[in-house]
Amino acid sequence: MARLILLRHGQSAWNLENRFTGWTDVDLSPAGEAEALAAARLIRDEGLDFSVCHTSMLTRAIRTLHLVQHELDRLWTPVRKHWRLNERHYGALQGLDKRETAARHGEDQVFVWRRSYDVPPPVIAPDDPKHPVHDPRYADVPPDVLPCGESLEATVARVLPYWYDAIAPDLMAGRDVLVAAHGNSLRALVMHLDGLDREAVSRLDIPTGLPRLYELDAALRPVSYRYLGDPAEAEERARAVAAQGRLEKN
């Protein structure tokens, strides 16, 4: 039976500041580093291991993975980095404070941008310096496939080819796999694995720094899945993710 561990990166500096991050490359906060180390201990306490790792091209996910590997003495484990595992691209919203954006545009509009399935955020133009076409890490990616702002639907369409081309073959070959990625790229994988419809995945919240363990049958269908550690903590962290972008109630 194949095992797959999905791990959202630890809290980033912009998670802490409640900003839309997307493809902006920010590092972990000190709390995020602690979350990554705690995730490693949860994996160790369960007696789990992994023989190959996948992550995005963004520092917060890469550093989370490296902290886990170091804590478990697994820095030698092969790592494959790919842009298709990057976070959803939030277009012109990237860098903006979520609550300030809700105050300016309305909480309902921000909710639609964040949580709807097929509505993209305001996009950025290809000549914008923040467009990924200007980032050397994507120099080998055809410019016409680099996003300027994505809906969750577009993120799913971007992520799933990597599942079929890279992650699934590793699992089918009998390798236990760790994927360290982002809230929305992991939502795309969970949608596929769990057979969620668009309404269900729009309500799904992935907490930072908590490993989600899948046991998969020979056809890569989930036999079981759960968050490692305290279920109440997973629920609390997921609620915190859901609350981002809501205005304070007086």
UniProtKB/Swiss-Prot annotation:
Catalyzed reaction equations: (2R)-2-phosphoglycerate = (2R)-3-phosphoglycerate
Sequence positions that bind substrate: 8-15, 21-22, 60, 87-90, 98, 114-115, 183-184
Protein EC: 5.4.2.11
Sites marked Transition state stabilizer: H182
Pathway in which this enzyme or protein is active: Carbohydrate degradation; glycolysis; pyruvate from D-glyceraldehyde 3-phosphate: step 3/5
Pfam family membership, one: His_Phos_1
MF terms (GO), sorted A to Z: phosphoglycerate mutase activity
Active site: H9 (tele-phosphohistidine intermediate), E87 (proton donor/acceptor)
Entry-linked InterPro entries: His_Pase_superF_clade-1, His_PPase_superfam, PG/BPGM_mutase_AS, Phosphogly_mut1
GO biological process per UniProt: gluconeogenesis; glycolytic process
Annotated keywords: Gluconeogenesis, Glycolysis, Isomerase
Annotated function: Catalyzes the interconversion of 2-phosphoglycerate and 3-phosphoglycerate.
Family, as annotated: Belongs to the phosphoglycerate mutase family. BPG-dependent PGAM subfamily.
Name assigned to this protein: 2,3-bisphosphoglycerate-dependent phosphoglycerate mutase
Chain's gene name: gpmA
